[in-house]
Amino acid sequence: MLRVALTGGIGSGKSLVGEILEELGALVIDSDQLAREVIERGSPGYEEVVTAFGDSILSEGQIDRSKLAAVVFNESDLRKKLESIIHPLVREAAEKLARKLPSGAILINQIPLLVESDGAKRFDYVVTVSADEEIRRERLRLRGLKDYEITQRIAAQVSDLEREKITNYIIRNDGSIDELTRAVEALMANELLPRAQKQGL
């Protein structure tokens, strides 16, 4: 199995790249989705997060992600505390899913905070999606985020330069969806499929 990490800053287009890779036959695990699942009520991380951050982050008994974000995004110590709870649980959940896959599979782990979680060494190959910051900001505005929230979230992540230090392949996503699709198809044909085939031998 070829284990690929797919990373990039908020608003870069990671999810779209993940969707295209899935259409091309890769199996995609979305760490953001797993992060939501591991802190749902009744899940392993729920009690830990509520104990760490208090009842003010709850809405009707569930952890309210926007309330939690408001607490942690301005405080790097609190953000690190949250990450120290969530990251191990997400890794464990991803590993369980990976164990069910056939040996020749291409497994894409979509991980926004790959550098921050020091997770690159667990993968055979790292792909970074990057885009001009103003384009990313515009995409995030379209998602309904306010400018100050966008600034906080971008500031909470490492720079593209830091991501590129651990990257094997960079996909620029400043253009059209057609251009992005062609770039992802080239990644699959020229890099991922040959590597997966070699591993399967």
Language model: regions and residue ranges:
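Residue-level signal for inorganic ion chemistry
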Residues: 13, 32, 82, 108, ...
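Short, acidic/turn-prone active-site loops that include or flank metal/cofactor-
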Residues: 33-36, 57, 131-134, 155-156, ...
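Short gly/ser/thr-rich secondary-structure transition/capping motifs
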Residues: 88-92, 107-112, 151-156
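An amphipathic alpha-helix signature
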Residues: 24, 46-50, 133-138, 151
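Small-molecule kinase domains that catalyze NTP-dependent phosphoryl transfer to phosphate-bearing small molecules
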Residues: 94, 120-122, 138, 142-192, ...
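Walker A (P-loop) phosphate-binding motif
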Residues: 1-26, 31-33
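ATP-dependent small-molecule kinase phosphotransfer cores
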Residues: 33-106
